[in-house]
């Protein structure tokens, strides 16, 4: 999860964490004086990734120090994108140097056009969420569609991160029957036999690919 602090008492969190925060505020810590609100539709975002991403970002924000020291990994700053206020995050979903730029949704098209215009010098190429998902998997991130409320650290070889002594959020869940049953569903990786075939997202695994419909999935 990524968090940036733009003020001492204001935090912005990305990814699908709103439902978790609402759950804990209602049932676990109802005494806390904290409000959460979704601002997703108020912002437009673009990821700039690759070995030349810092060069592109510097031309987009010439007045900012976006060097490794000025904007370290997981860093955050605000800037002016040709008259438009922008929020800049250094975060990578691809394993390469990458940034994410957010502007108010009304300025989304303007931001996109500027990124493409400035990026031409560096042979920039647009890529979509399908490509991003592939890059994210290659990076090693396990999130999104791979995880749900039934997934535990032991499913992903992350048992070394689970403390046996200290308390932590979710520790109680690890002792529930549903999470320790030997026949429980688990998240696993699927690799094609020829190592080349790309398995589309959302594909079904069936016992006999040539069987007539309906063909039950495994």
Model-derived regions, located:
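Single conserved hydrophobic/aromatic residue that forms the stacking wall/gate
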Residues: 1-7, 11
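Conserved, structured C-terminal
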Residues: 9-218
């Amino acid at each position: 999860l990524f968090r940036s602090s733009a003020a001492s008492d204001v935090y912005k969190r990305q990814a699908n964490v709103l439902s978790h925060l609402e759950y804990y505020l209602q049932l676990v810590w109802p005494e806390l004086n904290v409000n959460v609100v979704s601002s997703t539709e108020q912002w437009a975002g673009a990821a700039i990734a690759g070995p030349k991403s810092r060069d592109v970002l510097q031309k987009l924000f010439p007045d900012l120090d976006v060097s490794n020291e000025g904007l370290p990994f997981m860093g955050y700053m605000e800037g002016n994108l040709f008259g438009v206020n922008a929020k800049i995050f250094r975060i990578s979903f691809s394993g390469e140097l990458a940034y994410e730029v957010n502007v108010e949704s009304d300025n989304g098209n303007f931001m996109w056009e500027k990124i493409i215009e400035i990026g031409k010098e560096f042979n920039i190429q647009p890529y979509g969420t399908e490509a991003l998902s592939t890059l994210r998997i290659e990076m090693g991130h396990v999130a999104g569609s791979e995880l749900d409320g039934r997934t535990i650290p032991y499913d992903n070889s992350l048992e070394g991160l689970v403390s046996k002594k200290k308390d932590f959020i979710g520790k109680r869940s690890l002792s529930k029957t549903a999470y320790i049953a030997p026949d429980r569903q688990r998240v696993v990786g699927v690799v094609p036999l020829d190592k080349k075939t790309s398995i589309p997202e959302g594909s079904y695994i069936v016992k006999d690919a040539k069987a007539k419909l309906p063909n039950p999935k495994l």
